[in-house]
């Protein structure tokens, strides 16, 4: 790897708050906005890229809607489409599904797994949810209160992972114990 010393479009952040879209822009224009900031002006190319990104998150038919017309899960998928449009090497996700209802969260977890497999992009996913970590992660780090790494464990359970998957219970117990230990 190489040392990261400044921001770059090869690393994109998706935040927990799903109200990160510009309310006066349509879904399509929200996805295109970072591309325009990078200097892309060709309207045909902008449309091609935004359509492809929205297709990946199953929102192409919603491209003319405004953020106030979207559910929380749809807003989060638009944020992911914005990230994908820039073709990053790494997507950093800070508890992106934490404030969503259980059904939407499960759906977006499935969609994230499909995107990860299709796009071959590295996703660094921050969560306090053990189930989410075990189901989504290929490598799971547990942070200590002081900011260090308490555990670093490869997740060898074959994807897709469900609570019924062999090894899920043992892994869940291991992380639950680690989270409740001091230090």
Describe the role of every protein-language-model region:
Residues 65-68, 86:
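Conserved signature/switch motifs of ABC ATPase nucleotide-binding domains
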Residues 120-126:
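Conserved H-loop
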């Amino acid at each position: 790897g190489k040392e990261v010393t400044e921001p770059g479009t090869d690393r994109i952040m998706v935040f927990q708050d799903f109200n990160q879209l510009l309310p006066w822009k349509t879904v399509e224009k929200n996805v295109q906005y970072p591309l325009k900031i990078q200097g892309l002006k060709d309207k045909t190319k902008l449309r091609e890229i935004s359509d492809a990104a929205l297709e990946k998150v199953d929102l192409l038919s919603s491209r003319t809607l405004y953020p106030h017309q979207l559910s929380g899960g749809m807003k989060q998928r638009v944020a992911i489409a914005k990230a994908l449009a820039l073709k990053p090497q790494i997507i950093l996700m800070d508890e992106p599904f934490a404030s969503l209802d259980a059904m939407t969260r499960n759906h977006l977890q499935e969609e994230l797994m499909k995107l990860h497999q299709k796009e071959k992009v590295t996703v660094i996913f921050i969560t306090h949810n053990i189930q989410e970590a075990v189901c989504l992660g290929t490598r799971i780090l547990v942070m200590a209160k002081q900011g260090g790494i308490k555990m670093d464990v490869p997740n060898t359970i074959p994807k897709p992972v469900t609570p019924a998957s062999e090894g899920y219970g043992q892994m869940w117990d291991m992380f639950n114990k680690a989270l409740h230990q001091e230090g």
